[in-house]
Amino acid sequence: MLLEQRLEFIDSLPTLPTITQRSLLALPEFSEKPEHDINKPTASVMPDTIDAFLPGVSQAIIDDVNLCKLVMQNAATKKYPEDAQLFEWYRYYVDGLSRLGWVTQNRNLQEITIKKVGLTMDQVALEMAAGLIGANAAQILAGVAKKAVEAVQKDPGAIKIFDTHKKLGTQAKFDVAPVWLDNGGQANMILNCISLDARESTRGILFWKSTKQSTTIKSGAVRTYLDTNIFSGLRASLYKRYSESGKKFIDDLPDF
């Protein structure tokens, strides 16, 4: 795809929702936080999404990853808003990220059953990652993902952002995505889209824990990386259009 076509795609994407003054007051104040130490793991929270960053990921890359995902999740949700449209939502989301420079293979969601009591959302994400990068590597990523989920659970402002689209008693869609750098310095990510029946939890998917012997989920997960050569030509346009409005939907958590 030509650079001009990618830029036209960015221009065609919908704007982020407008937050009312009342809602804005309920969101966390983006006060001064300690500067991110590149040698430590950290995390960010967005609606339905927790991005868990391993040591070595700079703040600039964190910002790039978060904004790409926020913009495309918003576009996919506006195009396919119904729970029953999850398959279409996922395909549009993955295809859109590829237009922003993420190199991945489009893969349909699949239904799988995990036979385990007491499952939490980060453990479900681990199951997805293990099939892509192997159990040992997935365990390393899982440690950071678990800390990320726990950090969000303890932060009322982060919970509010994560629960932006929460509807209790229904299917819940979420993404717990580990992010790390490859030897070329490019961001790699397990791109998740996981949907399951969250009626067991009265507080939503963030605090969900399975009580059944098995849990059936719809899941799509692919390993992907951000091609810096492509994204460098798109960054300015993406940030110009979405950086300011995106701040209301992204909260960078303190390092672990």
Residue ranges of predicted features:
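Generic N-terminal initiation segments characterized by hydrophobic and/or small/turn-forming residues
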Residues: 4, 51, 64-67, 94, ...
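Short, charged cytosolic
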Residues: 84-98
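Membrane-inserting effector segments that mediate pore formation, membrane fusion
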Residues: 110-163
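Membrane-proximal, non-transmembrane alpha-helical segments
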Residues: 99-111
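Alpha-helical rod/repeat scaffolding segments in eukaryotic adaptors/tethers
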Residues: 79-86, 110
